[in-house]
Amino acid sequence: MIKKVLISLFILLCHIPLVHAEDFMNEIARANDLYASNNYQQAADSYESLRDRGFNNGHMYYNLGNAYIRLGKTGPAILNYIRAKKLIPRDENLQVNLNFAIQQTRDKITQPPPDTLAILFFWVNDLSLNEHINLAFVVNLAFWLTLTAWFYFRTDFLRLTRNLIFFLLLLAFVAISVKLHFESNSKTGVVLAKTVSVKSGLDASNITLFELHEGALVNITDERQGWVEVQLDSKQKGWIPKDSLGI
């Protein structure tokens, strides 16, 4: 597993009130120091405290996953690696550690293969949603600046530039729409319980269809009365208690 603790400029990457900035920075430094000194449980507790207070950062989730994998808690480790992947999708070390963690699980269930839409828009997942929004903002600004210049200087170069940037702007908005579709329609859960029985209905007395173990990745298809319906493939589907799963 790749060993990497990010001593952070996390604060620059998150939108948090300035009045809390110093507190967050101190807590990050404390958590990183605890991890560096092999106090993994205390480090994990500090990172979890930051998350509970609204701190949302891919590098923090990555470090939290590393702390849990050191503690042998593969379920929480995989859960936080997946959270990190949504925010820092191009981090190669993150993908290596996620693959390593999955190999430590009993079920060894990998992430589902991309569907047709994901294959067609393969480049969309290379950026986080925030990055797509920021990119669209920059392209939109460039378009209006170019359009303004074209009104004053109607040259062929500015006309072609305007049309090209307009096309890129449309592409940026399409990318945001596709990314939102991916995030709203693909709900992945991670089993946190050591073992959980997948039932045929919303009650513990129902038939056990199969069992899952800590760290198993599942697709959540429904939620009712404290239970969630999970699916592995077209044949393996059933209900488990919601509190046995991390989302």
Regions found by a protein language model. Give the residues of each.
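Boundary regions of SH3-family modules and the immediately adjacent low-complexity/disordered segments
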Residues: 74, 150-151, 156-193, 200-207, ...
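Conserved beta-strand/loop element in small beta-rich adapter and peptidoglycan-binding domains
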Residues: 207-223
